[in-house]
RNA sequence: GCCCUGAUAGUGUAGCGGAUAUCACGUAGGACUGCGGAUCCUAUUACCCGGGUUCAAGUCCCGGUCAGGGCACCA
């Protein structure tokens, strides 16, 4: 409906300009005025035309106003200075909007564009920690947004099963006492993390271990110890998957990088790169990208002939190029240089250059995290803490059976975490503080509460969905603002998908909840003259809040 | 040293070159609590510095300052 009123506004201006014999600019600019006294849409065409016509904007506006015809969806068109302001007829508009809102509100028709979206892809050398969480939450939310916007999306987790880090864990298994089960921790990924930490300690004391690890890598690329490597990775990954499941983060496919070495793809990639003429060789084979503005050459193979992460990544990206129309990667900004090198290499070989979404780091107040040094807060810890704090809040307010309270607490805890990350633009550096991440007084819990409140109201009124919208219903004030915001939701989805951004959805959910709460205070629903219309409105808010939260991977409980 | 990214109220944050800069927390008042108070209303305080482009700059360009990151035969 929002797009519809934009179109009506543009059409009316176009018609007016044609009537005046003025050449119509390619795009008629519209914006949303800063306050309701200035209407619902405003156009700045006169500013733009002023330069070309050598006339004052205000005069051009006056001319347009003299001939413009008001489309039926608008009540009036007025000029405020040089602006042309459109005022929506909220009686007509609101009814039409409510008729159009279904369960899947916000969804766009299929776009016939396949997106391969890689995210999380943390190394299986320990549990996910809060440094990884940003990748997972941005990636998963973006996948949901793209799907709602009509894209065909496949999410992939790229599993590093052959890097030095994994080889170190295998070394530990071969050389230290005890099997993985003997390491402390409830979850498999935590045990692997402990072992990894242990091996790092040994390595510090005895640098000679490094050669042994190199030997393991070499042998593995030649096909030895395959089961052992696989076992370690699967073991760790299964623990990580549990965590992601609890966070509501989903991947359609796990792609193991080792496959690209074993099936010869990496060798073929290296051969093809040689043929491009951009490679050079001393002890190692490298790619010289100076011509593309990158001073640092990209090393493709170690001196012992084994491959490197980036080399395998090139092979992986060529595969993704085959699978999708649009390739999106979510990466920490520390990968900027490497990603640029890989992107250029992929293009050299005729693949599609990925769009990369970079995010800045999450650090602890005392500094950065490190799996190697054992300094991190795991996502499991974070979620447990979120749950127990949320449970405390739930119990403080209401007396509920334990299992119900538990479910609600889980939704609220998860919501707090996901919202904490999703609401920020990715280029902001985050310093993690427990009380910021887990605040229930406001933030996500208040959005979930607005949803629960809507549910309760509908239940109380025995809402069926068949209620009629009364004649003469014409929203004003808070109610009008609520209608306006509802109409915007599909636009927010579309724009977020196009910009590959998640946080506008988070902001929108907050705005909608706030506006609904104000409306709830100021406007009676049950027993009012417009009970039918308002119940339909509340139901529409309910659906929209639920769908918006769902885009962020957050569950909206019906009671809390 | 070179490269990338940030800088907006006490704190955290949004902002397509356009009319009075968003939201949240905090603080201080207040409301109502008969559709659930995890509520509502009011007040409060901000675009790092210096140049430039433009009818119009928080937004674009150049130069500083501060902060984070990168510049591996790690990933």
From Swiss-Prot:
<protein>
    <recommendedName>
        <fullName>Arginine--tRNA ligase</fullName>
        <ecNumber>6.1.1.19</ecNumber>
    </recommendedName>
</protein>
<feature type="short sequence motif" description="'HIGH' region">
    <location>
        <begin position="122"/>
        <end position="132"/>
    </location>
</feature>
<keyword id="KW-0030">Aminoacyl-tRNA synthetase</keyword>
<dbReference type="Pfam" id="PF03485">
    <property type="entry name" value="Arg_tRNA_synt_N"/>
</dbReference>
<dbReference type="InterPro" id="IPR005148">
    <property type="entry name" value="Arg-tRNA-synth_N"/>
</dbReference>
<dbReference type="InterPro" id="IPR001412">
    <property type="entry name" value="aa-tRNA-synth_I_CS"/>
</dbReference>
<keyword id="KW-0963">Cytoplasm</keyword>
<dbReference type="InterPro" id="IPR036695">
    <property type="entry name" value="Arg-tRNA-synth_N_sf"/>
</dbReference>
<dbReference type="GO" id="GO:0006420">
    <property type="term" value="P:arginyl-tRNA aminoacylation"/>
</dbReference>
<dbReference type="GO" id="GO:0004814">
    <property type="term" value="F:arginine-tRNA ligase activity"/>
</dbReference>
<keyword id="KW-0648">Protein biosynthesis</keyword>
<dbReference type="GO" id="GO:0005737">
    <property type="term" value="C:cytoplasm"/>
</dbReference>
<dbReference type="InterPro" id="IPR001278">
    <property type="entry name" value="Arg-tRNA-ligase"/>
</dbReference>
<dbReference type="Pfam" id="PF05746">
    <property type="entry name" value="DALR_1"/>
</dbReference>
<keyword id="KW-0547">Nucleotide-binding</keyword>
<dbReference type="InterPro" id="IPR009080">
    <property type="entry name" value="tRNAsynth_Ia_anticodon-bd"/>
</dbReference>
<dbReference type="InterPro" id="IPR008909">
    <property type="entry name" value="DALR_anticod-bd"/>
</dbReference>
<comment type="similarity">
    <text>Belongs to the class-I aminoacyl-tRNA synthetase family.</text>
</comment>
<dbReference type="InterPro" id="IPR035684">
    <property type="entry name" value="ArgRS_core"/>
</dbReference>
<dbReference type="Pfam" id="PF00750">
    <property type="entry name" value="tRNA-synt_1d"/>
</dbReference>
<dbReference type="GO" id="GO:0005524">
    <property type="term" value="F:ATP binding"/>
</dbReference>
<dbReference type="InterPro" id="IPR014729">
    <property type="entry name" value="Rossmann-like_a/b/a_fold"/>
</dbReference>
<keyword id="KW-0067">ATP-binding</keyword>
<keyword id="KW-0436">Ligase</keyword>
